């Protein structure tokens, strides 16, 4: 059956790799991004814009929430309030906005797949990255709650928790922080966006039928629980 997916943050990094991987599976993909080259141009923090796009997009079967920012790199006591709030606005409120806009249509049709991009930082906490770590912990909790709420509807919601992935977003990660978190990976390398996209593609497919509200680590062995 033909499926349609919306991938937020779909113009770069994990989002772009996921869009390409889903297209290879025959999925019609609409990228949602602030980039003017995206299929759907919007800021995920703007709930009105997201709702308008959802209303105009037609039937959407798959939602991948990949839009995100690293936020401030500093000890918690030096983090500016606006940096904290912006990180939560994009990473958490953006995920909330898109889920709220697209999930009702999936419920009505009795089938859907939602994959939220969290981070291993949301489980372990990265030093000097408290806004990012806390925001990704919130994405994990949101996904667990949503998965339970949808469990009998045919719509499945899961999260992936990558370790460091080679993406443009990590250009905003301080070199000391990047070296520290890369050193925690037993495989001794960063991941590739295409590797994460393989996992996401499975979570978006008909092949995955008995998992919801789960968190899938893709961390090169870093995960501690």
Show the residue positions of the predicted features.
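Conserved glycine-rich cofactor-binding loop
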Residues: 11-12
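Residue(s) in the substrate-gating loop at a strand-loop-helix junction
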Residues: 119
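Short, small/polar-rich loop/turn modules that mediate ligand/substrate recognition or access, typified
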Residues: 151, 156, 211-213
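Substrate-binding pocket helix/loop in short-chain dehydrogenase/reductase
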Residues: 74-76, 83-85, 114, 181
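Active-site helix of classical SDR
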Residues: 99, 135, 143
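Short C-terminal tail/terminal secondary-structure segment
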Residues: 73, 124, 184, 212-225
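Alpha-helical segment proximal to the catalytic Tyr-Lys
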Residues: 104, 148-152
């Amino acid at each position: 059956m033909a499926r349609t997916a919306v991938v937020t943050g779909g113009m770069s990094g994990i989002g772009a790799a996921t869009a390409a991987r889903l297209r290879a599976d025959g999925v019609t993909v609409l990228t949602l991004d602030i980039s003017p080259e995206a299929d759907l141009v919007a800021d995920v923090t703007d709930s009105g814009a997201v709702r308008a796009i959802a209303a105009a997009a037609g039937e959407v079967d798959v939602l991948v929430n990949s839009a995100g920012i690293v936020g401030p790199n500093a000890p918690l006591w030096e983090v500016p309030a606006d940096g904290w709030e912006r990180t939560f606005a994009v990473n958490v409120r953006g995920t909330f906005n898109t889920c709220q806009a697209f999930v009702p249509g999936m419920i009505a049709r009795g089938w859907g797949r939602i994959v939220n991009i969290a981070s291993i930082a949301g489980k372990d906490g990265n030093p000097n990255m408290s806004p990012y770590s806390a925001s990704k912990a919130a994405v994990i909790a949101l996904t667990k709650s949503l998965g339970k709420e949808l469990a009998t509807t045919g719509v499945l919601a899961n999260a992936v928790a990558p370790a460091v992935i080679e993406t443009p977003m990590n250009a905003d990660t301080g070199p000391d922080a990047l070296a520290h978190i890369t050193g925690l990976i037993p495989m001794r390398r960063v991941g590739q966006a295409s590797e994460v996209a393989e996992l996401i593609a499975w979570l978006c497919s008909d092949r995955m039928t008995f998992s919801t509200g789960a968190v899938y680590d893709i961390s090169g062995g870093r995960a501690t629980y």
